[in-house]
Swiss-Prot record:
GO cellular component terms, A-Z: cytoplasm; cytosol
Source organism of the structure: Coxiella burnetii (strain RSA 493 / Nine Mile phase I)
Details of cofactor binding: Binds 1 Mg(2+) ion per subunit.
Catalytically driven reaction(s): XTP + H2O = XMP + diphosphate + H(+); dITP + H2O = dIMP + diphosphate + H(+); ITP + H2O = IMP + diphosphate + H(+)
Enzyme category, top tier: hydrolase
Entry cofactors: Mg(2+)
Biological function: Pyrophosphatase that catalyzes the hydrolysis of nucleoside triphosphates to their monophosphate derivatives, with a high preference for the non-canonical purine nucleotides XTP (xanthosine triphosphate), dITP (deoxyinosine triphosphate) and ITP. Seems to function as a house-cleaning enzyme that removes non-canonical purine nucleotides from the nucleotide pool, thus preventing their incorporation into DNA/RNA and avoiding chromosomal lesions.
Subunit structure: Homodimer.
Protein name: dITP/XTP pyrophosphatase
Keyword Glycoprotein among UniProt keywords: no
Nucleotide-binding is among the record's keywords: yes
Superkingdom: Bacteria
Length: 200
């Protein structure tokens, strides 16, 4: 069975990825099982950061590695927080602190346009020197709610309003969210490619 390292320390993200990839005949192993340390995300795009993380995990383990870099972009904030989504309120900030900073920044800006999108870029590298990593990209369009709502999900989910469902991402159950989310889209692309490539 093919083994692929999941290059993330984020337990919530890992759980989503493993759930969405469960039907593949591939063994996905969290990098924590190899004691792979985090690497600084120095890229200026989601693609660059995903590749940095995948390359690092592949180098440390000698196995193919899959990395996800995701973030929230908000039109009124010139696409912020973007690649800094997880560090928007400081390196060790909580989800609640990041959400509060976004709401305060929007209040200070012209918040008549509250459109936003979640992006997820997945990079799969066969080895650390893979010159052509597989890249999958999902985008989830929505709006920023005026206050947090819902208990599900993680990150900015409580303020990401999904007009088609008239609820925030945190008010969707996990199955609903995975069917339409940015990560769900990117992993669906990945699943299709892996199935065709490896006949898994």
């Amino acid at each position: 069975m093919l083994e692929i390292v999941l290059a993330s320390q984020n337990s919530s993200k890992l759980a989503e990825m493993q759930e969405l990839l469960r039907d593949l005949e591939i063994k996905f192993i969290p990098q924590t099982e190899f004691s792979v340390p985090d690497i600084e995300e120095t890229g200026s795009t989601f693609v660059e950061n995903a590749i940095i993380k995948a390359r690092h995990a592949a180098k440390q383990t000698g196995l193919p590695a899959l990395a996800d870099d995701s973030g929230l972009t908000i039109a009124a904030l010139n696409s912020a927080p973007g690649v800094f989504s997880s560090r928007y309120a400081g390196k060790n900030a909580t989800d609640a602190e990041r959400i509060q900073k976004v709401l305060e920044a929007l209040e200070a800006a012209d918040d008549s346009d509250r459109s936003a999108s979640f992006h997820c870029v997945i990079a799969l590298m066969e080895n650390e020197n893979d010159p052509a990593p597989l890249i999958c990209h999902g985008v989830w369009e929505g709006e920023i709610a005026r206050e947090p709502r819902g208990k599900n999900g993680f990150g900015y989910d409580p303020i990401f309003y999904v007009p088609s469902h008239q609820r925030t991402a945190a008010e969707l159950d996990p199955q609903e969210k995975n069917a339409i989310s940015h990560r769900g889209q990117a992993l669906e692309q990945l699943s299709t490619v892996l199935t065709e490539a490896f006949l898994v």
